[in-house]
């Protein structure tokens, strides 16, 4: 990780959605229509964050989006509130510099304001870098494999983390 990379993590603004969409389309195979981003921003604006270079304002290099949902706990049979990671992406030139980690830390703090009990996410089974980040840095646990989850037929790992196990903040 390049500790000299000076970034700011802050809420995404509506006029920055095109930059977020560009990062999404250039880095991830899952693409969403603009109204999807608008809905997340409208309902969970505090959990829709961007990262920008400190010395170059409005130069967005990554983003993270969460939503809150109710469902059965990944760790027991009870109805709970979950923070669900919708999307996380960092521009190619800024990967492996700690940007995703910083986005996750700051956004997970925000998601906690919704009194969630756990965090959940899906990640491509071939995305070893992301899996390493989620499991080894953030302590997410693999709950199951969602077969053929993605449009191209790839499996997703369904990972979860109990809120009380947030020992990385």
PLM region spans:
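Short acidic/glycine-enriched loop/turn segments that link adjacent beta-strands
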Residues: 44-45, 127, 150-155
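Conserved Rossmann-like nucleotide-binding pocket used by diverse enzymes
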Residues: 8, 84-86, 119
């Amino acid at each position: 990780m390049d500790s000299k990379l000076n970034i700011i993590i802050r809420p995404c603004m509506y006029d920055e959605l095109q930059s977020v969409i560009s990062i999404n389309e250039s880095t991830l195979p899952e693409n969403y229509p603009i109204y999807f981003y608008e809905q997340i921003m409208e309902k969970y604006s505090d959990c829709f964050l961007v990262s920008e270079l400190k010395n170059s304002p409005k130069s967005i290099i990554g983003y993270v989006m969460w939503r809150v949902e109710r469902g059965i706990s990944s760790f027991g049979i009870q109805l709970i509130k979950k923070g669900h990671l919708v999307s996380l992406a960092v521009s190619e030139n800024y990967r492996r510099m700690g940007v995703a980690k910083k986005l996750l830390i700051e956004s997970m703090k925000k998601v906690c304001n919704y009194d969630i009990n756990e965090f959940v996410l899906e990640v491509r089974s071939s995305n070893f870098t992301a899996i390493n980040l989620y499991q080894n840095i953030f302590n997410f646990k693999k709950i199951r494999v969602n077969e053929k989850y993605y449009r191209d037929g790839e499996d997703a790992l369904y990972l979860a983390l109990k809120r009380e196990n947030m020992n990385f903040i």
